[in-house]
Amino acid sequence: MESKVLLLLALSVWLQSLTVSRGGLVAADRITRGKDFRDIESKFALRTPEDTAEDTCHLIPGVTESVANCHFNHSSKTFVVIHGWTVTGMYESWVPKLVAALYKREPDSNVIVVDWLSRAQQHYPVSAGYTKLVGQDVAKFMNWMADEFNYPLGNVHLLGYSLGAHAAGIAGSLTNKKVNRITGLDPAGPNFEYAEAPSRLSPDDADFVDVLHTFTRGSPGRSIGIQKPVGHVDIYPNGGTFQPGCNIGEALRVIAERGLGDVDQLVKCSHERSVHLFIDSLLNEENPSKAYRCNSKEAFEKGLCLSCRKNRCNNMGYEINKVRAKRSSKMYLKTRSQMPYKVFHYQVKIHFSGTESNTYTNQAFEISLYGTVAESENIPFTLPEVSTNKTYSFLLYTEVDIGELLMLKLKWISDSYFSWSNWWSSPGFDIGKIRVKAGETQKKVIFCSREKMSYLQKGKSPVIFVKCHDKSLNRKSG
């Protein structure tokens, strides 16, 4: 008799554990139309514009009342934010910032934050493996919303950071219909660089997949962010390696000022920059940063890729043009070290002339640009080689919009060490014209010396060039 009582008591406790979960809601209600949602561990918080930092209301798959209780807007688009690996087991500070920026740009939208913190706090390889289960959770949730409420998945935009980008990709591959867009914010590299498409973010996971790569420094498979292109458009700001303001010198300065408590922030500075670049695109919609298609970052650094013909340039971030090429498009741009991140790109071409054949390596120069709106002075650049009667192309950028170019100054910087030959006779070149192309406006300008030729000497005064007045030159420059 006593054993039967104990058995009934144990059975009662077991049934109670099945039927009570998540704020007292009954788990049995999560069996809807023959589908069991009780295996979903991820939580889906619909945050509000008034409280972007707290998960105050959860949408629970299988519990239809939760959708009404959270005031889900069925007629608006939905953003689903998926965080990455975490050391602390808490949301990182960028999450409420992204939520706030999304609501500021799309006030009537739904912004859902996926909580998989318990799985994301494990050792990295374990958390990386969990992205498959998290992706399955998100897919089940989205399919339920589509089936139960006829909510169109074409209104869904998934945004995943680091490991969350791959979870977003897996989710997109498992939904009954494709979601509209997935944005990968520096998708994680380790365990995914050589993974097959079904196990990571890929172009097939949504109608359009765009990716920002901001921390790809290191050998493939060991860099924090994935190196290879995994979307329809893959953008590599500042080459995709280190980001401005995230260098070692900055790290030492911050440690000296704030102590070692911020070391983890510095380690992920470039990684997390992907999120802040996207936030910038939401808040500064009238001035989107422009990226340019290029075969390599080396060619981009030479200024050879500032063309916008045939979709060769695109906006970075929220206002990207959804161009779906057969092959993934790798694009590059420069940015500032802080918001707003937009800069203005220029290709500069200089022909160095002379009667004597000379070659100099690793030469430092400064150029100053003057326009109708502002000027940008003493912009440093280095040419790996300068030889007589050769033309060199390189990339410059300014942090301010200087308007239409009117004039420029060019200076050849003297060596930091003393040289008897330079003291006795400074080397120099004749320069007749300098060609400049503005990436943002696509305008080309040819600058001429005030004389027929200007003699540029190392360590001497800068040489001034003004816009050429020859109409035929202007026609050729486009």
From Swiss-Prot:
Span list, region Interaction with GPIHBP1: 35-56, 446-470
Annotated region described as Important for heparin binding, given as residue ranges: 433-437
Disulphide linkage map: 57-70, 246-269, 294-313, 305-308, 448-468
Reaction catalyzed: a triacylglycerol + H2O = a diacylglycerol + a fatty acid + H(+); a 1,2-diacyl-sn-glycero-3-phosphocholine + H2O = a 2-acyl-sn-glycero-3-phosphocholine + a fatty acid + H(+); 1,2,3-tri-(9Z-octadecenoyl)-glycerol + H2O = di-(9Z)-octadecenoylglycerol + (9Z)-octadecenoate + H(+); 1,2-di-(9Z-octadecenoyl)-sn-glycero-3-phosphocholine + H2O = (9Z-octadecenoyl)-sn-glycero-3-phosphocholine + (9Z)-octadecenoate + H(+)
Keywords from the named record: Calcium, Cell membrane, Chylomicron, Disulfide bond, Extracellular matrix, Glycoprotein, Heparin-binding, Hydrolase, Lipid degradation, Lipid metabolism, Membrane, Metal-binding, Nitration, Secreted, Signal, VLDL
Signal peptide: 1-27
Record GO terms (molecular function): apolipoprotein binding; calcium ion binding; heparan sulfate proteoglycan binding; heparin binding; lipoprotein lipase activity; lipoprotein particle binding; phospholipase A1 activity; protein homodimerization activity
Chief localisation class: membrane
Chain positions covered by the region annotation Essential for determining substrate specificity: 246-269
Record text on activity regulation: The apolipoprotein APOC2 acts as a coactivator of LPL activity. Ca(2+) binding promotes protein stability and formation of the active homodimer. Interaction with GPIHBP1 protects LPL against inactivation by ANGPTL4.
Post-translational modification: Tyrosine nitration after lipopolysaccharide (LPS) challenge down-regulates the lipase activity.
Domain PLAT: 344-467
GO biological process, one term: retinoid metabolic process
Gene Ontology CC entries for this record: catalytic complex; cell surface; chylomicron; extracellular space; plasma membrane; very-low-density lipoprotein particle
EC number: 3.1.1.34, 3.1.1.32
PANTHER family named among the record's database cross-references: LIPASE, LIPOPROTEIN LIPASE
Protein purpose: Key enzyme in triglyceride metabolism. Catalyzes the hydrolysis of triglycerides from circulating chylomicrons and very low density lipoproteins (VLDL), and thereby plays an important role in lipid clearance from the blood stream, lipid utilization and storage. Although it has both phospholipase and triglyceride lipase activities it is primarily a triglyceride lipase with low but detectable phospholipase activity. Mediates margination of triglyceride-rich lipoprotein particles in capillaries.
Subunit structure: Homodimer. Interacts with GPIHBP1 with 1:1 stoichiometry. Interacts with APOC2; the interaction activates LPL activity in the presence of lipids. Interaction with heparan sulfate proteoglycans is required to protect LPL against loss of activity. Associates with lipoprotein particles in blood plasma. Interacts with LMF1 and SEL1L; interaction with SEL1L is required to prevent aggregation of newly synthesized LPL in the endoplasmic reticulum (ER), and for normal export of LPL from the ER to the extracellular space.
Protein name per the record: Lipoprotein lipase
Organism: Ovis aries
